[in-house]
C-alpha cells in the first residue's frame, strides 16, 4: 500500500508541474496577477509531493519491501542499513527521482528568494522550470518508475552493485 502512495505522490507532483508550467505563463501573457501568483504555491506543493515520494521509497528500502521491483533489484536482507539507504539513488530509477527532487528544491529556492523581482518575471521563470519538471516527471512515471511492483514478492533481493558498496561513495 505504501509504494502506491509514493506513486500517487509522483502523479500529484506531475499535475502540479503541469499547472505550474501553464497557468503562470498564460497569466504573464494576459497580465493576470492571480494566475501568475499560482507559480509559487505550485512549486511548494510539487516539492512537498516529491519529497514524500522520495521518503516513501527510502522507507521501502529500510523495510526491505521486495514487492517494489526497484528495491528487489538493488537490495537484499544482508545489506547494511547504510547501503540500503544509499541504494535509494544507486540505480537509474532512484537517481532520476533524486534528480527531480533536487530540481524541485531549486524551484522552491527560486520561488522563495525572488520576492524582490517583478511578478511577471517570477511567473515566467517558474513556468519554464515547471515545463522542465513536466518532462522529467513524465519520463520517470512512464519509463523509469521506482514504484513498479513485483508480485509475488521475492523472498530475497538481488543486491546493490558491489562497486557502490564503499563508504566513500
What is each PLM-predicted segment?
Residues 1-169:
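Polytopic transmembrane helical bundles with strong interfacial aromatic enrichment
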